[in-house]
Curated annotation (Swiss-Prot), chain A:
PROSITE patterns: COA_CT_CTER. The keyword Cytoplasm applies. The gene is accA. This is Acetyl-coenzyme A carboxylase carboxyl transferase subunit alpha. It comes from Geobacillus thermodenitrificans (strain NG80-2). Belongs to the AccA family. The lineage of its organism: Bacteria, Bacillati, Bacillota, Bacilli, Bacillales. Pathway: Lipid metabolism; malonyl-CoA biosynthesis; malonyl-CoA from acetyl-CoA: step 1/1. The keyword Chaperone does not apply. It is found in: Cytoplasm. GO terms for molecular function: acetyl-CoA carboxylase activity; ATP binding; carboxyl- or carbamoyltransferase activity. It catalyses: N(6)-carboxybiotinyl-L-lysyl-[protein] + acetyl-CoA = N(6)-biotinyl-L-lysyl-[protein] + malonyl-CoA. Residues 35-292 form the CoA carboxyltransferase C-terminal domain. NCBIfam families: accA (TIGR00513), AccA_sub (NF041504), PRK05724.1 (NF004344). Component of the acetyl coenzyme A carboxylase (ACC) complex. First, biotin carboxylase catalyzes the carboxylation of biotin on its carrier protein (BCCP) and then the CO(2) group is transferred by the carboxyltransferase to acetyl-CoA to form malonyl-CoA.
From Swiss-Prot, chain B:
Residues 28-290 form the CoA carboxyltransferase N-terminal domain. The lineage of its organism: Bacteria, Bacillati, Bacillota, Bacilli, Bacillales. Keywords: ATP-binding, Cytoplasm, Fatty acid biosynthesis, Fatty acid metabolism, Lipid biosynthesis, Lipid metabolism, Metal-binding, Nucleotide-binding, Transferase, Zinc, Zinc-finger. The gene is accD. It comes from Geobacillus thermodenitrificans (strain NG80-2). Gene3D superfamilies: 2-enoyl-CoA Hydratase, Chain A, domain 1 (3.90.226.10). This is Acetyl-coenzyme A carboxylase carboxyl transferase subunit beta. It catalyses: N(6)-carboxybiotinyl-L-lysyl-[protein] + acetyl-CoA = N(6)-biotinyl-L-lysyl-[protein] + malonyl-CoA. Belongs to the AccD/PCCB family. Its EC number is 2.1.3.15. GO terms for cellular component: acetyl-CoA carboxylase complex.
Length: 325, 290
């Protein structure tokens, strides 16, 4: 059974009631089926209501759900013959990022993504999906390899952020992220980025300079975590809920701000309820994306990516407000 | 009376005075945050804001920086009228911008333009930490990207002085995207052989250090400048270990291979001129030509 979230409490109660009645019907000799039917109808209605009116903070909870499918879950479902490649050839292998080559229904691709764990043991191994510089350098190495062999690149974004640690600073966390932004901007193969969980700041963007950027409906993408924003802006981390709203971090917000291309719908209740179905939704968008991008040559791809990021942001001149370009 | 001599003097309640803000020197005197010596602001400014006693490099306003490195009267500003809007409708943001505009005399946290340095034409961007901590929002990103594009069009080197706390929270994810925008502009510039020199000054952290600041063909820094990705407190909280005294200073970065050189402010112009001259190439003798 998947862990329930705070806003799902009314649903949980109703579900339990239905379950109780069903159990009771088995033991006692009474017919409650019409009662149960009624309750089930109410449950469906309530579910629709709850999931249609998710607040940004609810979505943050879904994006952080421990059972939310990770990069490897989607790789397994979308590709065949995934062959994982390790190491940055400089320092080590960072397991907070996975990457390799794979077959996407006949199309050779390179797949890279942040990888978090679903339990403590796995999370320790994956450093909670928070990469060190060697992780980003591995990712870049694989992207350059993809470019050499003309393979499209697919990036799954799912991190709270780049790891804030002593060793990370010593080995140049800033430079590693900056280098990825710089080099990704020049890749002559299609790059499709999909935010599947949390997209945390520069650590997320370092895999995010794509021709197309898509987001799962309940994922988030932001310059800082709601807790971090609350601590900096209002000196109070407990105002995270308010920050989640103010900071505009949901897929719908980012679509409005002109940062992402498509919102990938999630299965009812969130991706963790059905990874197989969720993978199918991703598959649909990813195929369309690649089909469109594979029609462009290398130069056009670089140009399209450049223009995409150039128009992001809003500025004004004198009194007149216009988009950056 | 004798007795009066022994009566304790009346006590006065200590009313805390306004805390000293050494980062924003105002008025006649300035206190050095490092050696605590108090000196005439005028003399400090004349010394390029390098402490006369201990050599501490005080933050330098963008206009003074431009004056200190470019040839006199050569500077022409780009996009001076570009200002921020409030894309997220963030409460209080417009007022904060207004207040900083008045305080710093700047429209935004970066001044861009072109000029000459010892005769070498170049495009330049100078960040100023007195405007919203030099944080990068849409305007900072756009002005820098445009300056790079102009350098590219006119085949000039691009020089930047960074000073920034990172991305601007109040513009949310749009601030984050400026990291990609500026880096993309630099990539295109670089592919065409453009020369980019980055001089990191105190402080250069977060999204700025993790984008254009670290992408120079030459990465320089001023002595003692704080440079890093994550904040010291955040790191201390996550790793729970003692961090070295010089952690995230320019000297620390030099030791760990992240910088080409740490350069004293008094020698900056001269050293930059050397690099520019080598890139301009074509010495008088030409002995290598057949």
């Amino acid at each position: 059974m998947v862990a329930e979230l705070e806003f799902e409490k009314p649903l949980v109660e109703l579900r339990r009631k239905i379950q109780e009645l069903k159990e009771f019907m088995k033991t006692a000799d009474v017919d409650l089926s019409s009662e149960i039917e009624k309750l089930e109808a109410r449950l469906t209605k309530l579910e629709n209501e709850v999931y249609a009116n998710l607040t940004p903070w609810d979505r943050v909870q879904i994006a952080r759900h421990p059972q939310r499918p990770t990069t490897l879950d989607y790789i397994e479902r979308l590709f065949t013959n995934f062959f994982e490649c390790h190491g940055d050839r400089c320092f080590g292998d960072d397991e907070a990022i996975v990457g390799g080559i794979a077959d996407y229904d006949g199309l050779p691709v390179t797949v890279i993504g942040h990888q978090r764990g679903k339990d403590t043991k796995e999370n320790l191994r994956r450093n909670f999906g928070m990469p060190h510089p060697e992780g980003y350098r591995k990712a870049l190495r694989l992207m350059k390899q993809a470019e050499k062999f003309s393979r499209p690149i697919i990036c799954f974004i799912d991190t709270k952020g780049a790891y804030p640690g002593k060793a990370a600073e010593e080995r140049g966390q800033s430079e590693a992220i900056a280098r990825n932004l710089f080099e990704m901007a020049g890749l002559t193969v299609p790059v499709v980025c999909i935010v599947i969980g949390e997209g945390g700041s520069g650590g997320a963007l370092a895999l995010g300079v794509g021709n197309h950027i898509h987001m799962l409906e309940n994922s988030t993408y932001s310059v800082i975590s709601p807790e971090g924003a609350a601590a900096i802006l209002w000196k109070d981390a407990s105002l995270a809920q308010r920050a989640a709203e103010t900071m505009k971090i949901t897929a719908h917000d980012l679509k409005t701000l002109g940062v992402i291309d498509e919102i990938i719908p999630e299965v009812k209740g969130g991706a963790h309820r059905n990874a197989d179905e969720q993978a199918k939704e991703i598959d649909r968008v990813l195929r369309a994306s690649l089909k469109q991008l594979l029609a462009l040559d290398g130069e056009a791809l670089v140009e399209q990516r450049y223009e995409k990021f150039k128009q992001m942001g809003q500025v004004s001149f004198l009194q007149e407000t216009i988009r950056a370009r | 009376m004798w007795k009066d001599l022994f009566v304790k003097k009346k006590k006065y309640a200590a009313i805390p005075s306004e805390p000293l803000r050494p980062e924003v020197p105002e008025g006649v005197m300035t206190k050095c945050p490092q050696c605590k010596k108090i000196m005439y602001t005028k003399e400090l400014v004349k010394n390029l804001r390098v402490c006369l006693s201990c050599g501490y490099h005080h933050p330098m306003p963008a206009r003074e920086r431009i004056e200190s490195v470019l040839d006199e009267g050569s500077f022409r500003e780009y996009d001076a009228g570009m200002t921020s809007v409030n894309p997220l409708g963030f409460p209080g943001y417009i007022e904060k911008l207004e207040a900083d505009r008045r305080k710093s005399g700047l429209n935004e946290a970066v001044v861009t333009g072109e000029g000459t340095l010892e005769g070498h034409p170049l495009a330049i961007a100078v960040m100023d930490s007195s405007f919203r901590m030099g944080s990068m929002g849409s305007v900072v990103g756009e002005k820098i990207a445009r300056a790079v594009e102009r350098a590219h069009e006119q085949r000039m080197p691009f020089l930047i002085f960074t000073a920034s706390g990172g991305a601007r929270m109040q513009e949310g994810v749009l601030s984050l995207m400026q990291m990609a925008k500026t880096s993309a502009a630099l990539k295109r510039f670089s592919n065409d052989g453009g020369l980019f020199i980055s001089v990191m000054t105190h402080p250069t952290t977060g999204g700025v250090s993790a984008s254009f600041a670290s992408l120079g063909d030459y990465n320089f820094a001023e002595p003692g400048a704080l440079i890093g990705f994550a904040g010291r407190r955040v790191i201390e909280q996550t790793v729970r270990e003692e961090l070295p005294e010089d952690f995230q200073t320019a000297e620390f970065l030099l030791k760990h291979g992240q910088l080409d050189a740490v350069i004293h402010r008094h020698e900056l112009k001269e050293k930059l001129a050397v690099v520019l001259a080598i890139h301009a190439g074509g010495g008088e003798s030409g002995w290598w030509r057949n």
